[in-house]
Amino acid sequence: MCTSRQIIGSLLVLSVLEIGLGLSSVAVGAVTFFRVRMEQKPQLGDSSPVWSGACFLICGVCGIFCAKKKSGLIMILFSACCICGLIGGILNIQFLRALNKRSSSLYSLYLASMSLACIGISGCTISTWLTCRLASYEQRRMFLEREHSLHHSHEMTEKDTENITNGGGPLALNGRV
């Protein structure tokens, strides 16, 4: 079983990868969009690599926040960003598949964008899974801390009760025995 430190380390690595993929996707998408504008009339989906890259970029930044501060709300935010990254990547692939059938002059750029989207989708999927593992680990840790705290307070209560009932010495009230 992975430790919390290993999960956080993996999450940091994947988050940095997502940031890199996001920046690369935005760059390739911008180049593709400007080449399309020079060669032909822009169509629906020409800017989809930019949008999916933005989703991957946001996902990576939230992943770094999630790894640094393991609060429940940040984990939920990160999971939501990963789901948005998944949706953005899938839509990017679908739009580019349709555009690739119409124009073969930009095939290499479309292929690069689809490859980046596939890697980004995989990263988002693994990040979501790791976040669920981290949340489960944190929940278990908090439960054990609470259980230990309750067990400790229960032991202290038993000792106090035992001292009173078993003649554990006279009780001092206001300094008097």
UniProtKB/Swiss-Prot annotation:
Which residues are listed as membrane-spanning? 11-31, 47-67, 73-93, 106-126
What's the superkingdom here?
Eukaryota
Q: Which InterPro entries does this chain map to?
A: TMEM196 (IPR037661)
Bilayer topology annotation: Multi-pass membrane protein
Which key words are in the record?
A: Cytoplasm, Membrane, Transmembrane, Transmembrane helix
Q: For the region Disordered, what residue ranges are annotated?
A: 152-177
Q: Where in the cell is it found?
A: Cytoplasm; Membrane
Report the protein name in the record: Transmembrane protein 196
Q: What is the scientific name of the source organism?
A: Xenopus tropicalis (Western clawed frog)
**What gene name is listed for this protein?**
tmem196
